[in-house]
Amino acid sequence: MKFVLLFGVLLVTLFSYSSAEMLDDFDQADEDELLSLIEKEEARKDCIPKHHECTSNKHGCCRGHLFKYKCQCTTVVTHSGEETERCFCGTPPHHKAAELVVGFGKKIFG
C-alpha cells in the first residue's frame, strides 16, 4: 500500500511538472513557430517543386510531407545519340516506405 501511495505521489508530481514545462514551451513555441513560418515561406519561393527539373541545382529541392525531396538523376540518350544527364526532384523509395508506415500508424493510433 505504501508503494502504491508513493508511486501515486511521484506520478502526480511528474505530471504537474511536465504540464508546467509544456505551458512554458507553448509560449516559446508560438514565437518560434511564427519566425520559422516566415523563414519557410522565403525558402519555399526558391526551392524546386516535386517532379521539376533540378539538373542545375541538385540541392534546391523543396520539402515533402516528412522529408526533403532528393534530386534523382538518370542518363538520357537524345535523338542525336548523345548521352545527357537529366535530374528531377522526387521522393526516394525508402522515404516513400517511411511515409507509408507513418501514415498507416497515424490512421491506427489516431
Swiss-Prot record:
Family the UniProt entry places it in: Belongs to the neurotoxin 19 (CSTX) family. 03 subfamily.
Organism whose genome encodes this protein: Lycosa singoriensis
Molecular functions per Gene Ontology: toxin activity
Record bears the keyword Secreted: yes
Pfam family, one: Toxin_35
Keywords recorded for this protein, A-Z: Disulfide bond, Knottin, Secreted, Signal, Toxin
GO cellular component: extracellular region
Propeptide residue intervals: 21-44
Any coiled-coil regions, as ranges: none
Annotated protein name in UniProt: U1-lycotoxin-Ls1ff
Disulfide bonding pattern of the chain: 47-62, 54-71, 61-89, 73-87
Subcellular location: Secreted
Entry's free-text remark on domains: The presence of a 'disulfide through disulfide knot' structurally defines this protein as a knottin.
Tissue spec: Expressed by the venom gland.
Transmembrane segments: none
Main localization of the protein described in the UniProt heading: secreted
Signal sequence bounds: 1-20
